[in-house]
Amino acid sequence: MHSRLPVPASLCLLLLLPSVLPASMPGGLSPRDVTDPEVQEAAVFAVEEYNARSTNSNYFKALRLVQAESQVVSGAKYYLTMELVKTSCRKTNGNPKGYQEIQNCRLPPRNQQEKLTCHFEVWSRPWLNKTLLTKVTCN
């Protein structure tokens, strides 16, 4: 039995097909909900590592997780865009603060706040119990 759709109409249907299929492809970047627990875990790790590596005398805390994407690699790679702000909590040698403690730190007055937009890449391999911060850029 022949289709009653004219050739141009069936061609249009074929062209529309990719728009109804899932947008992500294996190995490609997929948008993630910023409230997803795995994304939140990667964000916590990124902020803790940022503070551990930073030479700033004060801690920075997360203001907002702006955007998150992930990629299936050997594990999962998270691409996070976050807003950070410098707190009034000073770093002390040998006694680093954890994420929750830092989130409770007070902020300087609004006109004295130092804010950063940071892009983090976090590579998680749970079966190895290993997470790495592979890239950080802040401005």
From Swiss-Prot:
<keyword id="KW-0646">Protease inhibitor</keyword>
<feature type="disulfide bond">
    <location>
        <begin position="89"/>
        <end position="105"/>
    </location>
</feature>
<feature type="site" description="Reactive site">
    <location>
        <position position="27"/>
    </location>
</feature>
<feature type="domain" description="Cystatin">
    <location>
        <begin position="27"/>
        <end position="127"/>
    </location>
</feature>
<feature type="disulfide bond">
    <location>
        <begin position="118"/>
        <end position="138"/>
    </location>
</feature>
<keyword id="KW-0964">Secreted</keyword>
<feature type="signal peptide">
    <location>
        <begin position="1"/>
        <end position="22"/>
    </location>
</feature>
<keyword id="KW-0789">Thiol protease inhibitor</keyword>
<keyword id="KW-0732">Signal</keyword>
<keyword id="KW-1015">Disulfide bond</keyword>
<dbReference type="Pfam" id="PF00031">
    <property type="entry name" value="Cystatin"/>
</dbReference>
<comment type="function">
    <text>Inhibits various C1 cysteine proteases including cathepsin L, papain and cathepsin B. This protein has no toxic activity and its function in the venom is unknown. It may play a role as housekeeping or regulatory protein.</text>
</comment>
<dbReference type="GO" id="GO:0070062">
    <property type="term" value="C:extracellular exosome"/>
</dbReference>
<feature type="short sequence motif" description="Secondary area of contact">
    <location>
        <begin position="71"/>
        <end position="75"/>
    </location>
</feature>
<dbReference type="InterPro" id="IPR000010">
    <property type="entry name" value="Cystatin_dom"/>
</dbReference>
<comment type="similarity">
    <text>Belongs to the cystatin family.</text>
</comment>
<protein>
    <recommendedName>
        <fullName>Cystatin-1</fullName>
    </recommendedName>
</protein>
<dbReference type="GO" id="GO:0004869">
    <property type="term" value="F:cysteine-type endopeptidase inhibitor activity"/>
</dbReference>
<dbReference type="InterPro" id="IPR046350">
    <property type="entry name" value="Cystatin_sf"/>
</dbReference>
<dbReference type="InterPro" id="IPR018073">
    <property type="entry name" value="Prot_inh_cystat_CS"/>
</dbReference>
